[in-house]
Regions:
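Edge beta-strands of jelly-roll/beta-sandwich modules across compartments, strongly enriched
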Residues: 40, 96-109
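Extracellular and analogous surface-interaction loops
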Residues: 16-26, 77-84, 373-374, 418-420
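A metal-dependent hydrolase metal-coordination microenvironment
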Residues: 126, 131-260, 267-287, 302-305, ...
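Surface-exposed beta-strand/loop patches in noncatalytic accessory domains
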Residues: 3-11, 32-73
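Solvent-exposed, flexible loop/coil segments flanking beta-strands in beta-rich domains
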Residues: 1-34, 107-112, 116-118, 128-135
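Beta-sandwich interaction modules
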Residues: 60-88, 95, 413-418
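Noncatalytic modules at the cell exterior or secretory-pathway interfaces
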Residues: 26-30, 78-102, 422-427
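Charged catalytic cores and adjacent phosphate/nucleic-acid-binding surfaces used
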Residues: 6-8, 44-45, 64-66, 110, ...
């Protein structure tokens, strides 16, 4: 065994451990120990190619990392390598350093034979894409989840069990800055690769990715706005970008990103977290402003689940669960690419209490996000029987509440004095007794509006 200790400070937060492997090992085992407070980002590089990432947060002070030739002998955030012979480098940087000196210890054990097995590493969900061609239409998912490989409390298997209990068809795994790529193999819930880019300027998800967001050659990649923008630009086309909890302090989104980069926005984030009621209301107001400016951003939800299923936050009256809220996406069949197509097409509904349904007597079933003809003016929103008593449906036309109802089935008609040849949009929000949105759908619309603003901060300044 080889053991190396590094002293890390706020002004010296970067380091690198290099070594060579000259024989045909079955596995390299790393054991990392740290002081508890900082976050450590580590990048595993083999012969100049990044093959893995590791995150140690304030929730851990130790992590075992298996670097193997197969999925089964590799840790969740490390892709297997055909051969381990060659030059290796473990680059790292620390953030959130409070003490004058922190310490990181890296211990390395080389296994020539009999590699250790990670019992939950069975399928590479980034490259071996899950699909279920028998699932079609409106499917239930979650776009914001965490495990023990960032700051969550659940294992991969526990996440899957919780998702099954919540009747999810799919979810995206979105650790902070790393990709949890290796998962247990099962057929009930599709798991797709993602990553929550976690920065001093807010958090944003990249959903349905085919490679990690961060490249160690540009480490750390987000310490200033210019570097963060470079990371975002480099990942255009690597899944889709979705801004997370835009008004949830201290993780609110502040970077003045071009809106052309953003496909969707998280409207409802973990509704059991104490500060999210106010943040949710602000997110919906921003969503209306974006649509009024002609930026038709898709609305989604994310549980941001960090806790065990039986745990809850202080002052919360219910546990924080994966699938709360759920996002329903209309797909041809369940594949990763079809889910992304559904988001880009704006065919989404978000709900905490069951699936809602939008119809029109002028057209029949309507897909959220659909551009409608001028003769479609009559709408009906159907809420499930599981809707809590006292919830209020608000119909919103161009950002203004135009009708309300407390019935499970509510209707709205656009009057003839409104010219639907012009640009208009319509959605309905379902609110609880405190006026906080619990369900919605991405608006339907008419006409076209060319945006005159181009960046995120411009919307905040102008509305």
């Amino acid at each position: 065994m080889v053991e190396i200790k590094y002293q890390v400070t706020a002004t010296n937060s970067f380091g690198s451990y290099e070594f060579d492997v000259n024989e045909d090992l079955a596995q390299i085992e790393l054991n990392l120990t740290t002081s508890l407070k900082p976050w450590y980002h580590l990048f595993v590089i083999h012969e100049g190619k990044q093959v893995g990432q590791i995150l140690i947060t304030h929730k851990q002070n130790a992590r075992q990392v298996l670097i193997g030739k197969t999925v089964a002998t590799s840790s969740a955030t490390v892709f297997p390598s055909l051969s381990l012979v060659g030059h290796w480098e473990i680059k790292f940087f620390a953030s959130q350093i409070d003490a004058e000196i922190e310490e990181l210890t890296i211990s390395r054990t080389d296994h020539l034979n009999a590699p250790l097995v990670d019992g939950e590493s069975q399928q590479d969900v980034v490259h071996e894409l899950a699909s279920n061609l028998n699932k079609t239409g409106w499917l239930k998912g979650d776009f914001h989840t965490h495990t023990i490989y960032s700051d969550g409390m659940m294992t991969r298997q526990a996440n899957l069990e919780s998702a099954k209990n919540q009747a999810l068809d799919f979810f995206v795994t979105t650790e902070h800055n790393v990709v949890t790529a290796l998962w247990p193999r099962q057929d009930e819930v599709a798991v797709y690769g993602g990553c929550e880019l976690t920065t001093p300027f807010g958090h944003t998800n990249f959903l349905g990715i085919d490679r990690p967001l961060l490249d160690a050659t540009g480490m750390p990649g987000f310490v200033d706005e210019q570097a963060l923008m470079a990371v975002i630009e480099a990942n255009q086309g690597n899944g889709i970008m979705s801004i997370n909890h835009p008004f949830l302090d201290p993780w609110a989104w502040t970077l003045d990103v071009p809106l052309a980069y953003v496909s969707s926005m998280e409207l409802i984030n973990d509704p059991t977290y104490r500060d999210n009621d106010a943040a949710t209301i602000k997110a919906f107001d921003l969503w209306s402003a974006l649509w009024n400016h002609g930026w038709q951003i898709t609305g989604i939800g994310g549980s941001d689940s960090h806790l065990l299923p039986d745990d809850k936050y202080p002052d919360a009256d219910m546990p924080s669960l994966i699938g709360d809220p759920a996002t329903y996406v209309f797909v041809e069949t369940l594949t990763r690419d079809n889910v992304l197509v559904g988001i880009k097409a704006k065919h989404t509904k978000v709900s905490r209490f069951g699936e809602i349904n939008l119809v029109s007597q002028d057209k029949g079933d309507i897909l959220p996000g659909e551009q409608l003809t001028t003769n479609v003016r009559n709408f009906e929103l159907q809420l499930p029987a599981t809707t809590p008593a006292g919830y209020l449906t608000e119909w919103i036309l161009d950002g203004t509440v135009v009708a309300t109802s407390t019935d499970l089935t509510s209707t709205y008609t656009i009057t003839s004095d409104i010219d639907l040849n012009d640009y208009h949009w319509l959605r309905a929000d379902v609110k609880d007794q405190n006026g906080v949105q619990q369900a919605t759908f991405t608006p339907v619309f008419w006409g076209h509006r060319q945006p005159t603003i181009t960046t995120y901060q411009e919307v905040l300044v102008n509305d």
